[in-house]
Amino acid sequence: MGVFALTGHAQSSIALYGLIDNGIFYSTNQGGNHAVQFVASPTETSVWGLRGAEDLGGGNKAIFKLGSAFSTANGTTWPSGRLFGDYAWVGLSNSTVGTLKMGRMQDSVGDYLGDFAAGGNWGGVLYAHPLDNDNLWGTYMVNNAIKYQSISLAGLEFGGMYAFSNKSAATSGSGSGFVDNRLWAAGVEYSAGPVRLAAVYEQLDNSGDDVPGSYGAVDVADANFTAARQRIYGVGASYALDHIDLSANITRTVLSSPTGEWQNAQFTGASSMSFNNYEINAIYHATASLDLKGAYTYTTASVSGRSPHWNQLGLLVEYALSKRTSLYADGVYQRVHGDGSQFSYAQINSLSPASGDSQALLGVGIKHRF
């Protein structure tokens, strides 16, 4: 992706990278109204940044990555106007031990399961599971994090991360805040020829509980939920054929004492809440330039004794004009059965809720990498 590299000496390099994605979409029902609108980053997050490496010898490298996500609609950076809100980390890698990173970065759910999900791979926010409850799209990035990733050992890789709360007092105002707004996670992946398998566990404690003048592991500007505890379990699998890539993932998110959610005006607190997501997706490489992509997700939830469930289907056709530039047509449909719960209105991620139980979105766009 780097368009050029700045070289300090033969063993060091810094590269500029980025992506811009824009679309025009028609939605059938947002608050009871049709809409035609400009959509920034519908299939992938628009971002620019720098990444670099310095060869330290003996199989060791110093590495870093800075990434700034931005809105192509108005040019603002996000989330919350951060200069490097996407990535800001530095680390060391060793060819036999693995890689250690420190800073702001993607969580382990994205690391291990992102490639198996349309929302985390080619479909973007519109294909995320309802409310992005498992963070497979990446609603939140992680602050104050230390992450380890092993090398491949006969196809097996593993790793984990811990993110500090940076807080001295507990939410209640007394005692230690060490466990408030912290995150820890672990994952494993196995690859053998055309087959890939992965599993991950991630836990957040009091996410969105900001430290005055600083940030916890997941601050309120990023959090997909605010809750006393959020646990995410997930597995994924993929199989690559000659012209078809097949993937599937199953995730479960359990919330204790949830009080808020990142986009849903329907949300009200409950003593507990859980979501189960089942997704299958495929990419058919019709020609060297044309890809046909599709995904289906079925989500069930348990909310205050109610059992809402969602069906979501998405289809995307992408045509590459070059290695860097492509055109696409995209469509997503969602239908929800609310079962008398607070989730009685369809809401494709990033849209306003519908006035009923179904919502559809159709559009075209252009994407350029540099």
Language-model segment annotations:
Residues L321, G356-F370:
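Outer-membrane beta-barrel "beta-signal"
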Residues F4-A10:
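Sec/Tat signal peptide C-region and signal peptidase I cleavage site
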Residues V179, G187-G314, Y333-Q334:
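Detector for outer-membrane/organellar transmembrane beta-barrel domains
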Residues I24-G32, F70-T76, S108-Y112, N166-A170, ...:
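Gram-negative outer-membrane beta-barrel proteins
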Residues A15-Y17, K61-I63, T99-K101, E157-G159, ...:
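Residue-level detector of the transmembrane beta-barrel scaffold of outer-membrane proteins
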Residues Q11-S27, A35-K167, D180-R182, V188-V200, ...:
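Outer membrane beta-barrel
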Residues N33-Q37, T76, D132-N133, A170-S174, ...:
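Extracellular loop and loop/strand-boundary signature of outer-membrane beta-barrel proteins
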Residues G49-R51, W89-L92, K147-Q149, G187-E189, ...:
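Outer-membrane beta-barrel architecture
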